[in-house]
Amino acid sequence: MTEQNFSSMRAAMVESQLRTSDVDDQRVIAAMAKVPREDFVPAERRAMAYIDRAVPLSNGRALNPPLATGRLLKEGRVEEGDRVLLIGAATGYSAALLTALGAKVTAVEAEDGPQLLDGAAKVVRGALAAGAPEGAPYDLLFIDGAVEEVPAALVQQLADGARVVTGLVERGVTRLCSGRVISGVLGLASLADLEMVVLPGFSAPERFVF
């Protein structure tokens, strides 16, 4: 495919997937219209970069559907200079978008996770659920996928009043959620059922019902 083909596909993604589905933040729209998503998927899957589903990467991981990324960015309300803790950076697509929005990004990815293809973010390799405490406190926790629960270890790395955007998975259903941390306590609200990739390493502890 030519660069013109990808530009046309990117424009179609914005018009048919984002604008029609409540992604109405013009800064987010502009960033997603500019950053070449095809550069963040394997070469053999570049033609799939703009489909409305997750794109397989490596080691069982996948790139979130465009709509999931757009909604996370919108609900994150990224401001210039925000310190963002990005969990599950994959190949760096969301890191590139967050950087385009003016954020200072610390991107966490597993040791055996995908190779980040964007050099704008500070990359930390290790357990996703451990975060990057050395860069704390953060203004925004951006979990780029769905988890069973947000670990306390991540909440503890956030500034008071910090924003949190994530997907939560329950009984096989993934939901977009957002919230804030006030006095060390995270409050999350469910916004919509939304297809998102499920990140490894975030299993909730088993709870017994009597």
Please provide the spans of the model-predicted regions.
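Class I SAM-dependent transferase core
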Residues: 1-101, 108-119, 183-204, 210
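Conserved nucleotide-cofactor-binding alpha/beta core module
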Residues: 77-187
